[in-house]
Amino acid sequence: MLESYQAQNQYHSDSPQKGNLKIFFGYAAGVGKTYAMLEAAHQAQKRGIDIVVGYIERHTRPDTLALLEGLEQLPEKIVEYKGIELKELDLDAALQRRPTILLVDELAHSNAAGCRHSKRYQDVEELLRAGISVYTTVNVQHLES
């Protein structure tokens, strides 16, 4: 049990400096949250900020796909579930790469079985605790009041 806990927290930073969270918010799928996040990433990159794509839901939108060009992208974690391959954020790769800003699409996503956390927001919390800032997206229907 202790070994498992230590392995899961090997990238945890004792530094008081936590990452910042920037949320691109929208009312529905397809309104341009991911597009706006990628545009902001290019602007940050032009200012010399170390920014990396951790996970982007591609949705085969040509304009969105084009904005991925020129940005470093981490390989996605492939998880097999009921005979199909699912793509997830590779949290360990992100923590090891340690960019200033990491792009992580769909904050409200439920991770596949086999991932460290059941929800993507938990991945983001771990990244923030490690001092990595995160740009992410969320739709209003995923919020609770």
Predicted regions and their residues:
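Conserved ATPase-coupling elements of RecA-like P-loop NTPase cores
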Residues: E106-Y121, N139-V140, S145
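Pre-Walker A adenine-sensing motif
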Residues: M1-Q17
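Conserved P-loop
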Residues: K18-Q96
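Loop/turn-to-beta-strand initiation segments
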Residues: D50, R98-I101, L127-T136
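ASCE RecA-like P-loop NTPase motor cores
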Residues: Q17-K22, I132, N139-L143
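Catalytic, metal-anchored helix/loop core of enzyme active sites in primary metabolism
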Residues: L89, R97, K119, L128
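Short amphipathic alpha-helical segments and helix-helix/interface helices
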Residues: A41, Y121-L128
